[in-house]
Regions:
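Cytosolic juxtamembrane N-terminal segment immediately preceding the first transmembrane helix
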Residues: 1-41, 55
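Structural signature of transmembrane alpha-helices in multi-pass secondary transporters
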Residues: 39, 68-71, 75, 102, ...
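Helix-loop-helix hairpins in multi-pass membrane proteins, especially solute transporters
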Residues: 87-217, 221, 234, 323
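Transmembrane core module of solute transporters
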Residues: 29-74, 180, 245-256, 260, ...
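Membrane-interface helix termini in secondary transporters
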Residues: 52, 83-84, 88, 174, ...
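Hydrophobic transmembrane-helix bundles of small-molecule transporters
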Residues: 177-292, 299, 317
Length: 384
């Protein structure tokens, strides 16, 4: 009897503790999902508003690309550094700092009156996103216990990563059509404020790990990619057939890109705290898969940028209609991502990579035939 009493006495508190733990995990999942949605949202929400941004601030065709590039380059170039910062300084602290930076940059970008102002804000958004994304993923693994809770959290994280693109298309169209292009940036401010307020309640601070930042690697890779993109976009042939490959600024930027990227490889081969240890490329399958994803991602970014401008300026679509027009593509990606995950254990990754690359290449070629007289179904929906 005496041994039964302590067990009975602990039952109620145990149930209450379990309830509190459940609420805590629910809040944590809400914060992580919202933060990831906010980061992914900006990959598409601004695209739909690009023609309006161009008219408002007077961007040229090549200059307008940098509204997208400024975000993508800083986000991609500093992503690994953002993850390292969370390990060294504490994940919750760094996560909140990233949210605040992203929100402030969005606010400033919404008030932009010059091209340089908007591009600087977009670059700052990318830095914030590069901090948020890896620390949010780390918080999933440190907050949720292994098993079903963590699996569910990872599923929600992945769903936000994919579904955020669809939300961005619709939200960008609605905000641009009924309010202003500036609201595709302002919308992040209240979302970020809520996440920043709830994050301290949702997460415990992680232990700091000793380590060093690979700043030389982060700087050379980001600047090298920026120089490469600038050189390639500046070298584009104009509509009247004039090529700029021989221009001094093109040659200088491409030379700088080579020097910086070679320096990055050298730094990573010598640094004990390398952001991208070169040994990861010893696995041929992993290297090939990463190369394919690089090619597909590059093509998708270029395609989406071009089509957004095309359907609004040539076909006369509104921002909302263009966002809806791209939804089937996002839906197809979401469905096929689930299908391919089921097929990998059965037939292996290589056949799927080959088939997927071939289908994507065929779709890109089909899209290259689009004209002002093309119909939506045959000219856009089919190849997408």
């Amino acid at each position: 009897m005496s041994s039964a009493q302590p067990a009975t006495g602990r039952a109620a508190p145990g149930g209450a503790a379990a309830g509190r733990a459940g609420r805590h995990l629910g809040l944590a999942l809400l914060v992580i999902a919202t933060a990831q949605l906010m980061v992914v949202l900006d990959a598409t929400i601004v695209n739909v508003a690009l023609p309006h941004v161009q008219r408002a601030l007077g961007f040229s065709g090549t200059g307008l690309e940098w509204v997208v590039n400024a975000y993508a380059l800083t986000f991609g170039g500093l992503l690994l550094l953002g993850g390292r910062a969370g390990d060294i300084l504490g994940r919750r602290r760094v996560f909140i700092a990233g949210i605040i930076l992203f929100s402030v940059a969005s606010l400033l970008g919404g008030f932009a009156t010059t091209q340089a102002w908007l591009l600087a804000a977009r670059a700052a958004q990318g830095v914030g996103g590069a901090i948020i994304a890896p620390t949010a993923l780390s918080l999933v693994t440190t907050t949720f216990p292994e098993g079903p809770p963590r699996n569910r959290a990872m599923g929600v994280y992945a769903a936000m990563s994919i579904g955020g693109a669809a939300v961005g298309l619709i939200a960008g169209g609605l905000l641009t059509t009924y309010l202003s292009w500036r609201w595709v940036l302002f919308v992040n401010v209240p979302i970020g404020a809520v996440v920043a307020i709830l994050a301290p309640r949702a997460f415990a601070e992680s232990e700091r790990r000793p380590g060093r930042f690979d700043l030389p690697g982060a700087i050379t890779s980001t600047l090298g990619l920026a120089a490469l993109v600038y050189g390639l976009t500046s070298a584009a042939t104009t509509p009247n057939g004039v090529s700029h490959w021989g221009d001094t600024k093109v040659i200088a930027s491409l030379t700088a890109a080579v020097v910086l990227l070679v320096s990055f490889v050298f730094i990573e081969s010598r640094s004990p705290h390398a952001l991208m240890p070169l040994r990861i490329f010893r696995n041929r399958n992993r290297s090939a898969a990463n190369l394919i994803m690089l090619c597909i991602g590059t093509a998708m970014f270029g395609m989406f940028f071009f089509l957004t401008i095309f359907v609004q300026t040539v076909w006369g679509y509104s921002a909302l209609r263009s966002g809806i027009a791209f939804l089937p593509m996002v839906a197809t990606i979401m469905v096929m991502a689930g299908v391919s995950a089921q097929l990998v254990p059965r037939i292996g990754a290589r056949p799927l990579l080959i088939a997927g690359s071939a289908i994507a290449g065929g779709g890109m070629f089909w899209l290259s035939r689009i004209t002002e007289h093309s119909h939506y179904v045959s000219g856009l929906l089919g190849p997408m």
